[in-house]
């Protein structure tokens, strides 16, 4: 069954007022950004950190996730965050989706690069795989486009300092290669490419499957 995004929301705040539609078992993925400071964004209780890194000395991004226990989960407060993307992601029966590998890049240019992922990170035994890209450009006049193969899911801007976008591709069957997009004005950016993997829950389909969260075969670039 294909990994799919059930819903997404964006808010210029440290918490989400209206969560995207979700149900028990869905992966809730939060992409949090602190603009104007390299102070780390702090995760709320119950969320697991997947990645965190400064954007030069003028920003900080944090990726966190949890699995919904009901259809009425809340975001909690992501301390120091100025902007949040929240995604609800589903998979097939008796499976879970987990965030596997992140490649990341940064620079100051009109060319924004989404760094390649490596052969060792591609889970050939997975039921399904998908990709999520996220980029922050510190010039609010720039127009962001989706990297090749992905579709824009949600965008945000504070209309003064930055613009941000998250994109998605379902049913990914090949390793992500280094890919560029261009913007009109040279600006500091931070880009991420996150692979999502679907795997059977142990014991749900006769055993097998990949290692589930807490011991997954993932990593960073």
Predicted region positions:
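Primarily extracytoplasmic/secreted proteins
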Residues: 1-220
